[in-house]
């Protein structure tokens, strides 16, 4: 029993959670213990968004993938990224934001110019914005958490939410329609970019709509202005491939 209890240990950290794994236990048995541990802890974590790291055992890419799939199956955790001991989470996020701020090439709009954000200032907000809370930024902003219904982000630049976006976003407040909004889960009450507004109640396939079937698998999306409308599309790999760092 002690072997089972100690084969998988979950500890919280300032960046998320660290999972300590037994080095000697056969992987298939360890995988079952991971399932049991996260199933028992699912109510504690709820649908939190966080980074995860593994310690105590060297994992192959396939083993790591299987563990993440098990965690997704038995819990509501939204895993933003996997860190190793050499990762600094702020550096990881800053690199991601730097890429996003340079340019996004929308795969389904080849005639559209790349979306660029001239703002060089980027602020970070770590935590959940709850109903009634407002975060304002003079440039662009990255939210390391969720924006709940009634929460609001106001930014002169672009907004990236590394979590669930279910509140209100106002990007490009100075009329900058080149600003954009990215979220790991895009279900906002309202998005405003420049002078263009889209609400969750709007009709039309190109505008924001609430998803009918919530999936635990995150599908990052980007919202941007084109032809005086706000479009929401999947943030696909071929869009990321076109990003260049200056």
Swiss-Prot record:
The keyword Cell cycle applies. Belongs to the MinC family. Interacts with MinD and FtsZ. One of its GO terms (biological process) is cell morphogenesis. Signal peptide: none annotated. Cell division inhibitor that blocks the formation of polar Z ring septums. Rapidly oscillates between the poles of the cell to destabilize FtsZ filaments that have formed before they mature into polar Z rings. Prevents FtsZ polymerization. It comes from Lachnospira eligens (strain ATCC 27750 / DSM 3376 / VPI C15-48 / C15-B4). Keywords: Cell cycle, Cell division, Septation. This is Probable septum site-determining protein MinC. Pfam families: MinC_C, MinC_N_1.
């Amino acid at each position: 029993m002690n072997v089972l209890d100690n084969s998988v240990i979950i500890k919280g950290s300032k960046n998320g959670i660290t999972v300590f794994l037994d080095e000697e236990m056969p992987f298939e048995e360890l995988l079952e213990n991971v399932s049991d541990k996260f199933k028992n802890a699912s109510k504690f974590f709820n649908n939190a968004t966080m980074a995860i790291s593994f310690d105590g055992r060297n994992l192959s890419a396939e083993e790591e993938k299987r563990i993440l799939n098990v965690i997704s199956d038995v819990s509501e955790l939204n895993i933003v990224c996997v860190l190793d001991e050499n990762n600094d989470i702020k550096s990881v996020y800053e690199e991601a934001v730097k890429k996003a701020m340079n340019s996004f090439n929308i795969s389904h709009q080849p005639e559209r110019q790349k979306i660029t954000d001239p703002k060089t200032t980027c602020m970070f907000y770590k935590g959940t914005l709850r109903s009634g809370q407002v975060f304002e930024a003079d440039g662009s902003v990255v939210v390391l958490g969720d924006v709940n219904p009634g929460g609001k982000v106001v930014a002169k630049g672009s907004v990236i939410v590394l979590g669930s976006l279910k509140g209100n976003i106002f990007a490009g407040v100075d009329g900058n329609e080149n600003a954009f909004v990215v979220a790991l889960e895009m279900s906002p009450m309202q998005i405003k970019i420049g002078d263009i507004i889209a609400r969750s109640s709007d009709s039309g396939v190109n505008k924001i709509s609430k998803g009918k079937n919530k999936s635990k698998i995150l599908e990052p999306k980007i919202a941007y202005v084109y032809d005086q409308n706000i479009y929401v599309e999947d943030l696909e790999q071929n869009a990321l491939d076109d990003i260049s760092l200056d």
